[in-house]
Amino acid sequence: MKLALIIGAGASIPFVPSLTSSFLTKELRRWDNWTGIISRVPSAINVSKRDIRRIVRGILSQTRKETNFEHIIEIIDKVCGYYTNNKKSLFNKEVNIIRRSNKDKGGSRNCYAIIPFLAREIIADAISSSLKNGLDSELLTKQGEFIKFLVSKSNNVSIISFNYDYVLDRTQNAINSKDYPSPSFCNGFTKEASDGYELDLEKLTKASNSIVFPHGSILFNHKYNGRRLIYNSSYDEAEADRWRSLKESYPPKQTSVGQHGVNTIDFNTFIVSGQTKETTMKNAPFNRLYQKAVDDIYKSDAIVIIGYSFHDEHINSVLSYYTETRKGHKVIVVDKQEINDAVDG
């Protein structure tokens, strides 16, 4: 029997209560975070920090207060892609934002090229700071015990995480230790490199017990013009490596490695965010990670879903197809229930 465990943001919140969408939105809107991250832009790449600040302030000023961080990143990607991609046509929404933000009066292509990277670094820093405040070891143990329980029921378990954090990574380390004699999980990053572990898609595809991060991770880093995806063992190493890559090669390849679309560049970064995830899924290696996730979901005899918000259409369509075509197979959804929530019966 094959099992699939799908983990969304709600699965991390018990470990780190602050890791909510509203928290990440506040951090992305916080101007101090932007001034801090912009100040880190290396002078060697010769872009105007003043122009970057002006562009970002203009974009943020035109987004509604209720807009969450993924929508903000979507707008950032499209506006910056518009200018990085020689001003190809856009939908009216983005054109209006550009006009109202007065973007046509300045800012080089290089300025626009770096902003999507900076936005994701703010998100990554916010997540890392929350995690550094301490992960509950008891909860990590419980998550490990739950995964161990699934493995006891099946020798073919696929874990699909849509989270950017490294909560599951720490659990995986425990699962693969001597304390857990169950079969080890493979996340595909098995090729040792001087700067971390490189993705081996063949091993990931063949792994019976696997962990897949189709939306990326704050531990990821693109190297060598985006041709290699590296997994670092710590956030500090991953972050330092990303900034080194930025200094060595500009415009930043890890934000412009995606192909030119009809309206914009697909910003294929270390984390896949925004409301344009489906577009990024066309690009390697995220397309292969997504294919692995889809394949494992469809081949599963049962699916357990924890903390997933059902906001990603590229995943919802797969689950919908599964329930319609795999009659009699179970889909178990685990969610938080407040004490005063109404319960039938």
Where are these regions (language model features)?
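Short mixed-charge
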Residues: 177-203
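SIR2/sirtuin-family catalytic core signature
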Residues: 1-16, 21-59, 67, 201, ...
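A short secondary-structure junction signal
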Residues: 169-173, 222-232, 315-318
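Acidic, metal/cofactor-coordinating or nucleic-acid-engaging core segments within structured domains
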Residues: 46-53, 232, 236-295
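A recognition module on extended beta-rich or small alphabeta surfaces enriched in W/G with H and D/E
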Residues: 195-234
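Gly/serine-rich nucleotide phosphate-binding loop at the start of the catalytic core
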Residues: 1-170, 174-184
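Short linear interaction motifs
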Residues: 138-147, 192-197, 286
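Conserved beta-strand scaffold positions in the cores of enzyme catalytic domains, especially
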Residues: 159, 211-213, 331
